[in-house]
């Protein structure tokens, strides 16, 4: 179930403040954030945002196709190590 249209998209205020500060200084450094729930706005395009995955910050370069999605969608939190392989061969009884 999606967010109500009357509420509009959400982004943490501290993240918006960091992006506006970089836009004013014309600098593009990596922005570290823990806010996986923030929606990507068009003003985020071209910036690299390091999103926390529970262990480390993973850099995500924001492109035009990502607008409207959440930051957490692009950084998986679980590592899949594959299914257990059984190399047991059938033996004659």
From Swiss-Prot:
InterPro entries from the UniProt entry: Ribosomal_uS19, Ribosomal_uS19_bac-type, Ribosomal_uS19_CS, Ribosomal_uS19_SF
Molecular function as annotated in GO: rRNA binding; structural constituent of ribosome
Function according to Swiss-Prot or TrEMBL: Protein S19 forms a complex with S13 that binds strongly to the 16S ribosomal RNA.
Gene assigned in the entry: rpsS
Keywords: Ribonucleoprotein, Ribosomal protein, RNA-binding, rRNA-binding
Pfam families xref list: Ribosomal_S19 (PF00203)
Keyword RNA-binding in annotation: yes
Cellular component terms per the entry's GO annotation: cytoplasm; small ribosomal subunit
Lineage: Bacteria, Bacillati, Bacillota, Bacilli, Lactobacillales
Entry-linked HAMAP family: Ribosomal_uS19 (MF_00531)
UniProt protein name: Small ribosomal subunit protein uS19
GO biological process: ribosomal small subunit assembly; translation
Domain of life (superkingdom): Bacteria
Record-stated family: Belongs to the universal ribosomal protein uS19 family.
């Amino acid at each position: 179930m999606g967010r109500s249209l009357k509420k509009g998209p959400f982004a943490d205020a501290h993240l918006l403040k960091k992006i506006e500060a970089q836009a004013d200084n014309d600098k593009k450094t990596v922005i570290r954030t823990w806010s996986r729930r923030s929606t990507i706005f068009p003003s985020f395009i071209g910036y690299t945002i390091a999103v926390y995955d529970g262990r480390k910050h993973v850099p995500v370069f924001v492109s035009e196709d990502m607008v409207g999605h959440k930051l957490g969608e692009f950084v998986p939190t679980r590592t899949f190590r594959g299914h257990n392989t059984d190399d047991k061969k059938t033996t004659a009884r």
